[in-house]
Structures are given as C-alpha cells and as structure tokens.
C-alpha cells in the first residue's frame, strides 16, 4: 500500500527565477535541481503548472517547440525545478534543433546539482529515439529518472495499463534507476506520485555546495 510522502515543500510556492540559453548562463551550480525534459508536444509545461497548482508558471503554447531556453523555478531555498527545451519537433529549423541538443546534452552531462530527471512522453507515442537518448544520458551520469506517460486520459483504462506495463518492461534495458508512472494534467492523475518522487529527491539527495573553483 502506498503512503503519502510527508514534506515541508510547498510546490504552490514555486516561482520563476530565470531563463538561460545554455549552461554558461545558469546560476551557481549548487543545491539540488530536478529537470523536466520531453518532446515538444509531451505536455511538459502543463505538468509543471499542474504540479505547482499554478495556471501559468510555465508557459503553455499551441505551438510545440516554443520553449527554447532553460527555465529555472525555485521550490525552496537551494531546491529548483528546471524546464529544459522541448526536443524533436519537426518544424523547428535544423540549426536550432542542433543548438537545443547541444544545450540539453551539456546540461545533463555537466550540471553537478542535477539530481533527478523527469522525462515526459505522450502515452500514445512513448520511447521515441530522443526519449531513449535522454534516459541513456541520465543513466550514464548516475541520475535517477522518472518517466511520466502524459495525456493518460486519452486512453481507456485497459489500454493505459497496457502502455504502462510495456514501457516499464522496456526501460529495464537501461539498467538504471528508472521509474515509470502515468500522468494526466487534465484529470490531475499521477500528481501525488510526482510530488512524492520530487520530495524524495529533494530530501534524500546530497546538495552540491559552493566551491572556490569557477568554470
């Protein structure tokens, strides 16, 4: 039986800190960060707004691929959520795609305060090549992963469970700390499990301390 995680974190108090085009423009690499990544139409902004119970914390757009910057939000002192650029949208110019990929890869490989990665995938189209690449990057860097199968309300219960079981089976091949859950911003499904996972990461992970060496 699942118990509700006790936490002193109030996600409704999460506030926007800054946007950055790449890792060099981010604030000091200290504390704990949990990043949200996903294809441009995976529902990333909606998930962040649902998590924090704020309608416009993260901008949602009818045009997938609008999030071109790394966006930082503070939950509490030294505890941040990071909205990474959406990837994989066909109509984005090739050069911009490469730029985003570089920024994503650099952030995942070099950001020491990154302790957890939430990868969002449309439950109807999970585990595309770039989704798998994100999970591989995280596992190779010993970063824990939570896969959220979004838009779960689009499928009937039986199909939803089948997709969940299929993806859970598939991610075993990554040989890492990869958990998979269903999520629906519309129905508020899976929000408690997301908060519990974030609570665990923010409370159990070791925060990165300030050092004298700068990059």
UniProtKB/Swiss-Prot annotation:
Keywords recorded for this protein, A-Z: Cell cycle, Cell division, GTP-binding, Magnesium, Metal-binding, Nucleotide-binding, Septation
Cofactor (UniProt): Mg(2+)
Alphabetized PROSITE patterns for the sequence: G_ENGB (PS51706)
GO (cellular component) term, any one: cytosol
Any single Pfam family the record assigns to this protein: MMR_HSR1
Taxonomic superkingdom: Bacteria
The keyword Magnesium appears for this protein: yes
Keyword Chaperone listed: no
Gene3D superfamilies to which the protein is assigned, alphabetical: P-loop containing nucleotide triphosphate hydrolases
GO terms for MF: GTP binding; metal ion binding
Binding site for GTP: 38-45, 65-69, 83-86, 150-153, 183-185
Residues holding Mg(2+): 45, 67
GO BP of this protein: division septum assembly
Domain EngB-type G: 30-204
Function: Necessary for normal cell division and for the maintenance of normal septation.
Homology family: Belongs to the TRAFAC class TrmE-Era-EngA-EngB-Septin-like GTPase superfamily. EngB GTPase family.
PANTHER family assigned: ENGB-TYPE G DOMAIN-CONTAINING PROTEIN, MSS1/TRME-RELATED GTP-BINDING PROTEIN
Protein name according to UniProt: Probable GTP-binding protein EngB
């Amino acid at each position: 039986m699942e118990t509700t995680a006790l936490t002193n974190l109030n996600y409704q108090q999460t506030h926007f800190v800054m946007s950055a085009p790449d890792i060099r423009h981010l604030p000091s690499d200290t504390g704990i960060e949990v990043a949200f990544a996903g294809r441009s139409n995976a529902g990333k902004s909606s998930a962040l707004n649902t998590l924090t119970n704020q309608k416009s914390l993260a901008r949602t757009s009818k045009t997938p691929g609008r999030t071109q910057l790394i966006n930082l939000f503070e939950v509490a002192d030294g505890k941040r959520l990071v909205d990474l650029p959406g990837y994989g949208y066909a109509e984005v110019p090739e050069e911009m795609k490469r730029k985003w990929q570089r920024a994503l890869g650099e952030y995942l490989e070099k950001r020491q305060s990154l302790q957890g990665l939430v990868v969002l995938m449309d439950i109807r189209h999970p585990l595309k090549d770039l989704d798998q690449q994100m999970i591989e990057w995280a596992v190779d860097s010993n970063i824990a992963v939570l896969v959220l199968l979004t838009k779960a309300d689009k499928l009937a219960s039986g199909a939803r469970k089948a997709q969940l079981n299929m993806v859970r089976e598939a991610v075993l091949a990554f040989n890492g700390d990869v958990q998979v859950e269903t999520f629906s911003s519309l129905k508020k499904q899976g929000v408690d499990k997301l908060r519990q996972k974030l609570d665990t990461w923010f409370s159990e992970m070791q925060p990165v301390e300030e050092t004298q060496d700068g990059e």
